[in-house]
UniProtKB/Swiss-Prot annotation:
Known pathway: Glycan metabolism; pectin degradation; 2-dehydro-3-deoxy-D-gluconate from pectin: step 4/5
CC cofactor: Zn(2+)
Protein name (record): 4-deoxy-L-threo-5-hexosulose-uronate ketol-isomerase
Organism field: Cronobacter sakazakii (strain ATCC BAA-894)
Source lineage: Bacteria, Pseudomonadati, Pseudomonadota, Gammaproteobacteria, Enterobacterales
Record-level Gene Ontology MF annotations: 4-deoxy-L-threo-5-hexosulose-uronate ketol-isomerase activity; zinc ion binding
Length: 278
């Protein structure tokens, strides 16, 4: 488990490139036949990926001491979105088929969660966010047909995109976790511009669908103290509440956003005008 401490905005603005990447960038999400796990002190989110190829993969009791529990989801809820080939997730004996772009919400208290791929030649790639939970909501699969799509932006500003809201109150109940998938239209490069912050939630962006020799310049920092991190395919960036989170790619891409915090009101954000950025 990779543990990331919280960081004050005054400290963050003094960091060089290596320091910013060390504090906020998660470089490796998928490892064959393993799970990855990054624990952030910011709202206690856990971020990672599971890529079963030749065997099933599950999170066992090895995380118990670090999380202070007997099993992974004893006091946590889990959101998963598959960005790879067909797979299966078994939750306490119940099997859920997971095609590409399918999501699965797993409620607090699930004792055994097992991940597997249907085809080793085209393995599933399960990206997940995990947050503390105070009660149990039912485990539920969410398909692309179930999500609440919102179309934003336009070609002239290079930000035409579709926001697919997977785990939000309109789709299913969770304690605090919200997740969704945003896909840029071909030829569009910007996400979340004009940008915003949200004081009551943190957020993680996971970028994927980037072709070789492509990247995203992820913008972060306070609106008047912006910085950037160069992000490659299948990497994630942790965004504290005080930070903007936006990006521009060398070509179109897709990203999964995940938020945890004190509310789930999607529009509870503080907008920042482009003219006010520094």
């Amino acid at each position: 488990m990779d543990v990331r401490q919280s960081i004050h905005s005054d400290h963050a603005k003094t960091l060089d490139t290596a320091g910013l990447r060390r504090e906020f960038l998660i470089e490796t999400i998928f490892v064959a036949d393993e799970y990855t796990m990054t624990y952030s002190h910011i709202d206690r989110i856990i971020v990672g990926g599971v890529m079963p190829v030749n065997r099933t993969v599950s999170v066992g009791s090895e995380v118990g001491k670090q999380l202070g529990v007997s099993y992974f989801l004893e006091r946590r809820e889990l959101g998963v979105i598959n960005i790879g080939g067909p797979g299966l997730i078994t939750v306490d004996g119940t099997r859920y088929e997971m095609n590409s772009r399918d999501g699965l919400y797993v409620g607090k208290g699930a004792k055994e969660v097992v991940f597997e791929s249907a085809d080793a030649a085209n393995p599933a790639r399960f990206y997940y966010n995990c947050a503390p939970a105070h009660t149990t909501f039912p485990t539920k699969r969410v398909t692309p047909a179930d999500v609440s799509p919102v179309h934003l932006g336009e070609d002239v500003t290079s930000n035409r995109r579709t926001i697919n809201k997977y785990f939000i109150p309109d789709v299913l109940e969770t304690c605090q976790l919200s997740m969704g998938l945003t896909e840029l239209a071909p030829g569009n490069l910007w996400n979340t511009m004009p940008c915003h912050t949200h004081e009551r939630r943190m957020e993680v962006y996971f970028y994927f669908g980037l072709e070789e020799n492509s990247c995203v310049f992820h913008m972060m920092g306070q609106p008047q103290e912006t910085r950037h991190i160069v992000v490659q395919n299948e990497q994630a960036v942790i965004s504290p509440s005080w930070s903007i989170h936006s990006g521009v790619g060398t070509r179109a891409y897709t990203f999964i956003w995940g938020m945890v915090g004190e509310n789930q009101v999607f529009d509870d954000m503080d907008h920042v005008a482009v003219k006010d950025l520094r």
